[in-house]
Amino acid sequence: VVMACVMAGIYLWIVDHAARGISIENVLKRYRFAAIIYYVRFLLNGAFFYLCILYLTKKYLLPDKSTFFIGFPLLLLAYLMNQGGLTKRGRVMEGIFWFVLLPLIFVLILSMANLSWDELAVRSWCGREMLNGSILVFALMHPIEFVWFYRGDMKDGPIRMRSFAGLMILFLGVFASTVGSLGKKLTMVDPEPVMSMAQGVAMPGGIMARLDLFLIAFWIVGVFCVFSGYLFYGNESIKHTFSKGRIVGLSLSYGGIYVISPWIMTTFATWIRRYFFVFIYGNLVIGLFFPLILFLMWRKEQKDEKI
């Protein structure tokens, strides 16, 4: 987890220096093909996270409800939130951030009563496995690429790392609580070890039986923020590049995902399971190098024009 966060920190440093002072709006207007690529990529990523929300909701909260019933309020909320622009998105996410984060921290604190410190002790390690695991965790952070879309418009200096450091501490807390509660072997074979950890946590006095609901809410809200972010930035890339593409882009993303909800839960889910690592690692590579190349090309052309 620590190595993955270090990799993510290096990623942010690259973005900070490559995109500083350059609005991605201008870059996409110059390279229109890039706007189309971003729209298609972000639509696929949005479908993936939409699938995650539907899966979590149907499995843990509303098992008898259809995907259309669950998906409609999600897409409507995402649309209303995104129509207000980046500022409104930020305010909405600020409003729900502590609402879901504090219960998660509470669950992690209670889980400490069940920790086995022997399970957390490192008695041997393999450098290759640690590197592979670190790269996988880093790849799972691929929505970090959103920073390319607003770094150039930031006027208050370099990217601050305080919130990123807090995220690393949160990841370490989830990791320690899960492995310390379930043990290494069970964590490796359990398909959803974090949920199993939360289900084993008990509140003193038995006041509340299902503390895993806090964790479910955290995952759903967190995934929703990423899902709506992909739809927002995908449509923003089209809106700023093609003057008549906004309505078409909105219809294909919000309406299209809703119409094909059953397909997403069946065929698309099968593809994701089969090619999961291709999807994750491909996103990581493209999300880093594609915008980096675009911004470097922009800087070179601007420099040549001045000469």
Segments the model singles out, each with a brief description of its role:
Residues 52-58, 75-96, 152-155, 271:
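Membrane-water interface regions at transmembrane-helix termini and the short interhelical loops
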